Amino acid sequence: LQRGYKVYKEVCSACHSLKFVALRNLGELGYTEAQVKAEAATWTVPGIDPNTGEASTRPGEPTDYFPKPYPNNVAAAAANNNAIPPDLSLITKARADGTNYVASLLTGYRPPSEELLAEHPEAAPGPGLYHNVYFPNMNLAMAPPLTSNGQVTYDDGTEATIGQMATDVAAFLTWTAEPTLVKRKQTGWPVLIFVLFATILAWFSKTQIW
């Protein structure tokens, strides 16, 4: 998940927001409290100048949410061929088999085959569009975000192939859709063990009483 976060930060965050995810949630990825604070400070968030009261920017804090890359939809559309990049917080929940969909989409860019164009001329990408075999209508406004192996350098030494980066960021975006899932799973086993123990104890007590 930390690898996927790095791909999001260095590649995806230039266009896509995570407006429902707080920077403090990075602690769920295995970062310490100090690391979360330091990582939050690498993000620039909107702020208010305490001296003038005017809008400004400041380093992020754990209590902040991931900042948006554009101030509004007009600016977002102007920078992206009139297409507004979607927020990615819940993207894997918004698609069937969302994790695999995201990973496939990121690796599905390729020129349309001659056979496809012969049968479906409308499949040719128009100006500002890119052919992707996994996109519903085969052409989308998003340029290939993962363009070369090694585009991101992983801290753990994992080779950052396009396929690996796609898999990692898809896993990260699955986490952003439910950032407390890891903690709930970790809590689940002790709870189940306690319930099982309590059930056995209750059964044993009943047999002794009756």
Language-model segment annotations:
Residues 1, 5, 81, 95, ...:
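Solvent-exposed, acidic/flexible segments
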Residues 6-18, 67-71, 84-93, 101-104, ...:
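C-type cytochrome heme c attachment motif
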Residues 86-127:
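Acidic, glycine-rich loop-and-strand cores that form catalytic or ligand-binding grooves
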Residues 134-136, 142-178:
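Extended, hydrophilic extramembrane loops/domains of integral membrane proteins
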Residues 17-90:
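His/Cys-centered metal/cofactor-coordination and adjacent catalytic loops
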Residues 1-6, 17-31, 35-36, 157, ...:
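Electrostatic cytochrome c docking/interface patches
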Residues 1-18, 189-194, 198:
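Sequence/structural segment immediately N-terminal to covalent heme-attachment motifs in c-type
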Residues 184-210:
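Juxtamembrane interface at the cytosolic side of transmembrane helices
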